[in-house]
Amino acid sequence: MQLRQQSQQQLQHFHTVRLILGDQLNAQHTWYQQVDPKVLYLIAELHQENTYVTHHVQKICAFFSAMAQFASELGAAGHQVRYLTLDDTQGFTDLNALLECFVAETGAIKFEYQRPDEYRLLAQLSQLKLANAVVNCVDTEHFLFPFDEIDREFPQGRHRLMEHFYRRMRKRFNILMTDGKPVGGQWNFDANNRQKLKSQDIKSLPTPLMFGHNVEDILERLQRHGINTMGKADTRLLWPINRIQSLELLQYFCEYCLPAFGRFQDAMTQQHPAQWSLYHSRLSFSLNAKLISSLEVINAVIEHYHANPFIEIAQVEGFVRQILGWREYVRGIYWANMPNYANINALEAKRKLPDYFWHGKTRMNCLHHALSQSLDFAYAHHIQRLMVIGNFCLLTEIAPDEVDKWYLGVYVDAIEWVEMPNTRGMALFADGGIVGTKPYAASGSYINKMSDYCGSCHYKIKERSGALACPLNSLYWRFMDKHRAQLSHNPRIAMLYRTWDKTDETARQAILATAEQHLAQLERL
């Protein structure tokens, strides 16, 4: 197999070929400190990366656009770069086949790649054998917690409390610390950050900063190659596709969203055009593609906090915890437990995803909004992902493999290292407690507490049994009843079982029967 003739003719002889994957767009990597005309950088649109799950069309457009921009910027800086589109790579079944051909045609005697953040790709590249070139792997130089410390910090198969890890990271990098103690006198302000949006709050929601990169050529290319996608296609991409735009979005977050971020980070609404973005940074794609780094995001937020005394520490700490704590933590969980983590199904959930996960048409108003938003924007904020969609999948016993594939495909920021621990671990409790100490199961009352979805829903939020009862209510109690033997020893849950036991037997049976009816007609909820 050879590269397309047009691509082949442009190749010269190089000493070294360096591969850049689509989520390795880190312009600050030491690779780029020196310009060497004998080093050729390869960035490629790969069929294998667009077919292992069905991706949201905006996700593919975002990655392809960012990859092309990065290639252009490297070239402008004097580096030798080859960008291969799907047209160029269509003859290759997988990445290794492409690399064997490409490296051979350049005459390179050295091939280098940055360690992939997905186990699947690391395993694949570890098997790469090149006839005339030495293969070398280097670090991505992106994450704060060193890769070679993961096994020591995260024992395989065991729970490691995120809060303890987060505090050590705060100390290690001296973030929000004063004389060895946390700024504000406490480590965690989560209790301050659970407010519902009131009508006056909704009116003042900021209009999200969106970009408008033309992706018509990418959409046409995807169609020409028969790439199956999901979600709403838009010729104008709203996501940042380069470092400058990512920093612009960071600055926008600091100015317009940070002052209220923590307070409303768990809130949801259906009453504003910005209901999909609220006060969230939407920097996750930029971070996960490595267009910007965790530390510069954290430093920008803290600098803005110091320059604006009206911003409360609770708003800042809540954001820092997501980046410095949770993001680094789930990466550790992922690498410490793969590849077995991908097969864990502690609760033996086996149902398939309902069809409305691909069109959003369900009478459950909370789920309708969370799904529709995901399909429209390739994005949902974390509470929608965890407590609406994830909670629904947990209570209805959707197979973890099904949920993993959907989450990995639908969200623009989804890469397996961050998606799987959040989904299989946090949302589904399929890992049996490696990530969370208890399932994040909730009845409809939680949704009602944090949103305005329930008032206009087809189902009745205050009812637990009957055809019109909120499905989450009966499904919640069915879940707790079914898994009692496994969960009742947890002191955080024991009180719930005392409440259940005090419920009249007739009422309990009606609730459980309603749950079974909902499960029987899952496609029609």
Give each language-model segment a name:
Residues 2-86:
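N-terminal beta-strand-loop-alpha-helix module at the start
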Residues 9-11, 21, 274, 280-525:
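C-terminal catalytic domain of photolyase/cryptochrome flavoproteins
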Residues 15-27, 31, 57, 184-312, ...:
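Substrate/cofactor-recognition hotspot
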Residues 19-23, 44-45, 84-86, 113-116, ...:
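Short His-Asn-centered micro-motif
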Residues 28, 55-56, 64-68, 73-92, ...:
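Long alpha-helical, hydrophobic tracts
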Residues 28-32, 53-55, 93-96, 121-126, ...:
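A short acidic (Asp/Glu
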Residues 44, 134-146, 417-425:
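A generic structural motif
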Residues 92-239:
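Beta-rich, aromatic/charged-enriched effector core domains that present basic-aromatic interfaces
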